[in-house]
Swiss-Prot record:
Binding positions for Zn(2+) per the UniProt entry: 270, 275, 277, 283
Subunit structure: Monomer. Associates with 30S ribosomal subunit, binds 16S rRNA.
Keyword Magnesium: no
GO CC entries: cytoplasm
Main localization, broad class: cytoplasm
UniProt function note: One of several proteins that assist in the late maturation steps of the functional core of the 30S ribosomal subunit. Helps release RbfA from mature subunits. May play a role in the assembly of ribosomal proteins into the subunit. Circularly permuted GTPase that catalyzes slow GTP hydrolysis, GTPase activity is stimulated by the 30S ribosomal subunit.
Organism: Prochlorococcus marinus (strain NATL2A)
CP-type G domain mapped to chain residues: 86-245
Disulfide bonds: none
Protein name, UniProt field: Small ribosomal subunit biogenesis GTPase RsgA
Length: 312
C-alpha cells in the first residue's frame, strides 16, 4: 500500500466534500521518494480521526492539519490533529483568513450600499482586513468610477477596480492578492466572483451564470468553499454568494466596526462613555456621514431584536 504511518506532515484543508477533507501538502516534505512524479504540492483525500469528533474539534477549509497514514500512490491519508486558528470567518466558514476581498459590481446588479456594508461588517466583526474589488467597471463611465473610489475612500476602505473584459486592474489585483496568505473572495451573487477567479487562474475553469434580468441579481453558482493557488504561496477562496449577511454584534461595539466612525472617535471623545451615537448630548459622531442612517437603523434592530445582538 506504500503507507507511511510514522510520518506526520502538515497540510492545509482546501475543500470539504461529504465526509472527506481535501488536504494539500508539499511534496518536498515526503520521506518516500518512490513517487517523485508527484512534483510540488499535491492534494490528498482524507478522513479524520474519530478522536477529533469526540473532542468537538470542527475542521473547516483553511485549517492547518496534521496528516498521517499517507497512501502516496492513491493520494489518501488520515487527519490526526488540527492546529489553533489565527482567524476565523463564520460565513462563509473559512479558517486562517488574512484578507477578505469583497466583490461589488459597478453595474448589473446595481450597487447596494446596505448590502456592501454588511459584507464589510462581516470582515470587521472577525477582525480581518477587508478589501473592496469593484467589478464590471467597463459598464460605467470614468466619472462614475471616480465617484465609487471616493465613496469607498470616505468609508475608510481601499478599492481595486477591475474588468475581466479588458483586463483593467487585473495585474494590480494579482499583485495585492499575492502579498497575503489566504484571501476569501466574498460578495453577493452575480457580481462576477467566479468569472474573476477564472480570469485570475485560467486553469480552474469554474462554471458561471448570468444576472437574472427579472430579479436584477445573480444566481448561486458556487456551492462550496474551495482554495486555489494564485502564486507566491498565496491561496484564494471561492465562496458561495449570499445577498444579506447577518450582523451579530453588541450595540456598544457596533460603531467601532465603521472605519469612518473609528477615525472620529480616535480624535475626540463623546461626553458619555456609554454613548451609542444616537441622540445623546455631546456625541462626536458626524450624523451627516453617508453610512450613519445605516448604522442607526441596524443599531435599533440590535437593541430591539429577540435574538442576542443581531440585526437583519
Amino acid at each position: 500500500m506504500n503507507k507511511n504511518k510514522s510520518n506526520k506532515l502538515k497540510g492545509i484543508v482546501v475543500a470539504l466534500k461529504a465526509n472527506f477533507l481535501i488536504v494539500e501538502i508539499d511534496h518536498k516534505n515526503f520521506k518516500d521518494h518512490s513517487f517523485d512524479q508527484f512534483y510540488g504540492k499535491i492534494r490528498l483525500l482524507c478522513i479524520r480521526r474519530s478522536k477529533l469528533n469526540y473532542q468537538g474539534l470542527f475542521i473547516d477549509v483553511g485549517d492547518i492539519v496534521c496528516v498521517e497514514s499517507i497512501d502516496y500512490k492513491n493520494k489518501r491519508a488520515v487527519v490526526s490533529d488540527v492546529e489553533p486558528r489565527q482567524s476565523f470567518l463564520k460565513r462563509p466558514a473559512v479558517a486562517n483568513v488574512t484578507l477578505v476581498s469583497i466583490c461589488i459590481s459597478a453595474d448589473e446588479p446595481l450597487f447596494d450600499m446596505e448590502q456592501t456594508s454588511r459584507f464589510l461588517l462581516t470582515a470587521e466583526c472577525a477582525n480581518i482586513e477587508p478589501l473592496i474589488i469593484l467589478t464590471k467597471i467597463d459598464l460605467i463611465t470614468k466619472n462614475d468610477l471616480i465617484l465609487y473610489i471616493n465613496k469607498f475612500k470616505s468609508w475608510g476602505y481601499d478599492c481595486i477596480p477591475v474588468s475581466i473584459h479588458n483586463s483593467q486592474g487585473i495585474d494590480s489585483l494579482i499583485e495585492r492578492l499575492r502579498k497575503t496568505k489566504l484571501t476569501v473572495l466574498a460578495g453577493p451573487s452575480g457580481v462576477g466572483k467566479t468569472s474573476l477567479i477564472n480570469h485570475l487562474i485560467p486553469t480552474v475553469s469554474l462554471p458561471t451564470s448570468s444576472v437574472s434580468k427579472k430579479l436584477k441579481r445573480g444566481t448561486h453558482t458556487t456551492r462550496h468553499v474551495e482554495l486555489f493557488a494564485i502564486g507566491n504561496g498565496s491561496l484564494l477562496a471561492d465562496t458561495p454568494g449570499f445577498n444579506r449577511p447577518e450582523i451579530v454584534c453588541e450595540p456598544s461595539d457596533f460603531a467601532f466596526l465603521f472605519p469612518e466612525f473609528r477615525t472620529q472617535l480616535s480624535n475626540s471623545q463623546c461626553k458619555f462613555r456609554n454613548c451609542l451615537h444616537r441622540d445623546e448630548p455631546g456625541c462626536v459622531i458626524d450624523k451627516d456621514l453617508e453610512r450613519y442612517p445605516f448604522y442607526r437603523q441596524n443599531l435599533e434592530e440590535m437593541i430591539n431584536s429577540p435574538l442576542p445582538y443581531q440585526a437583519g
